[in-house]
Amino acid sequence: VRQTIPGFSLIWIGMAHDYFFWTADADTVRRRMPGIREVLGRWLQQVQVDGSISGMGGWNYLDWLPEWHGGIPPEGVDGGGASFSFMLQLALRQAAELEKHLGEPEMSALFERRANELRIATTRLYWNESRGLFADDRAHTSYSEHAQSLAILSRAAAGIELEQVARGLLAGKGLYRTTIYFTHYLFEAYRMIGGIGQLIHRLELWRQLGERGLKTTIEAPEPSRSDCHAWASHPLYHYFATILGIRPSAPGFQSVEIAPQLGAMKWANGTLPHPRGEIAVEVRQEDDRLCAVVSLPAGSDGVFKFAGTVTPVRAGRQEISVPSRTRRMHSTTRA
């Protein structure tokens, strides 16, 4: 049976973007840029005069919510609705960043312009001022964590709108909740808005898998017999990239940003593979300070960020101690 899921083509662009930053293999991404442009061109053909998306054939699956028939969000049968628009905006911005680094500034500018045009249209169609949230549909009858998370990640929510969306997402009231794989995007949004406490709480689903006799991550909430699904293993990524806060800040992992978020945790440590070796990080809350031990491979450098402080880090082992204080928002260099 032929099965086409258009939204996965946008996720593929995000995977290429991640690969470009996390590995030293730029050539693989360069060879895929024609395909990335083709995917974006196909989606942009479906943008209507009012800025909505329509006419995208296939199975427009987004997430396995029980309330969404076939995993399709409101207004999403033909690729419409807020979430797919935000996904397209995010993919356009990711592609723009790739084009810039790969020497195509004109293509980069084009993709940024189209993302900004969509942002204006999506806000006009889906923003609900009284609720301070983006609706899933133009009738403003449905609201989800999916749309709010993607609005944050795609930079569609900015300024006062970002503050309102962040409050609404952290409160979680009246929102359809993400399920297993899509919670990755929720966790990425939590990272940006200081929601580490909510992130750690939502990990309870994965903690319960062992109690059910499972040794692998499942695709969808019960009842489910898809018992081994790689996309559901993203908490491993978030332990290193969000809790320990280890992320590349330049293509090829040439520079590193370490911005830990422990929440109520007292300590965390881990060792992450790097193109030049390994990055080891240990962080510990001690009274009113955060103490860290960071080891970077030869030829690497970066910064350690915490509670408004920025400390340069270099190759080798170094100890860091900075004052601890609560922050409401956590800014990032990359979506």
Predicted regions and their residues:
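Long, well-ordered core segments of solenoidal/helical folds
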Residues: 1, 32-52, 113-133, 157-177, ...
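Solvent-exposed loop and edge beta-strand segments that line ligand/cofactor-binding
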Residues: 1-9, 67-87, 130-148, 154, ...
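Active-site acid/base region of carbohydrate-active enzymes
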Residues: 7, 22-84, 102-148, 253, ...
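Generic recognition of stable, solvent-exposed alpha-helical segments in well-folded globular domains
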Residues: 11-14, 31-38, 83-97, 110-117, ...
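Non-catalytic C-terminal accessory modules of carbohydrate-active enzymes
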Residues: 113, 120, 197-335
